[in-house]
Amino acid sequence: MANPSCRLLSFGLVPYCQAWQYQRRWVRAKQRDRQREDGLMLLEHPPVYTLGTGSQTKYLKFDPAYPPAELWRTERGGEVTYHCPGQLVGYPILDLNHFQKDLHWYLRQLEEVLIITLEKLDLQGERIAGLTGVWLEGHKVAAIAIKVSGWVTCHGFALNICPDLEGFSHIVPCGIGDRPVGSLNQFLPGLTVEIVQPLVIQAFAEVFPVTWIATGEMPCWLSDDVA
C-alpha cells in the first residue's frame, strides 16, 4: 500500500486563532472527503496561553479576566500551556485509518518524533512514565495535546527551542508543578527554529511514513471561508 500523501505547510509566526481556524477547516475537509491529503502545519505563535476542554483554572497564576497574553480555551485535551516565538509548534492533521486507530499509540508516536529530533542534535530526550511529553535532563522541552474526531487528528506538539521561558512562570504548565520547563537552547546554545525545523520534518517522516506534498502554497480550500 502506498504511503498516504501529506501536505507540509510552514507558516512562520501565526496568531493562535488563525492556526486554530486552519486546523478546523482541514479536519472538516477530510471528514467530508477521506481522499483529501493529510497535513502537517509547522509554525510559531505570538505569546498566548491555551486551555484544554477540561483545563482547570487553578493552574493559572493570573486572573483569567486579565491575562498577561491572549488566552484561549480550545477543544484539545490537557491542561494550560504557553506558546511564544522560539517554540516550534506542529499541528498534524492525520487520518489514523492510515496508521493505527489508537490514541495512546498516537501520543507515543508524537513523542517519538521529538525524541528522534533531539537524537539528531546529539541530545537525549526521554519520556516519563504516566506523563505525556518529552524531557531533557529533567526539564520538559516538549508538550503534546491532541483532539481526534472521526479518527482525524488536530492540535499536536510544541517544542521549546529558543523561547523566552518567562511566560511559563504565570502558569503551572500542563498542571505539572514539580518539574521545570526547559528549552533546547539551554543545552545546545545557538539553536534556532530554522535549524531544528528540518530535523522535525525528517523525524516525522521516519515515524509516520508519508509522501510529502511540499508546494509551499496554501491550498484554496484551506484559505477560503468556504472550505
UniProtKB/Swiss-Prot annotation:
This protein's pathway: Protein modification; protein lipoylation via endogenous pathway; protein N(6)-(lipoyl)lysine from octanoyl-[acyl-carrier-protein]: step 1/2
Protein name, per record: Octanoyltransferase
Keywords, ordered alphabetically: Acyltransferase, Cytoplasm, Transferase
Keyword Transferase: yes
Ranges of residues in domain BPL/LPL catalytic: 34-212
Site (Lowers pKa of active site Cys): 140
Organism: Synechocystis sp. (strain ATCC 27184 / PCC 6803 / Kazusa)
Superkingdom field: Bacteria
Similarity comment: Belongs to the LipB family.
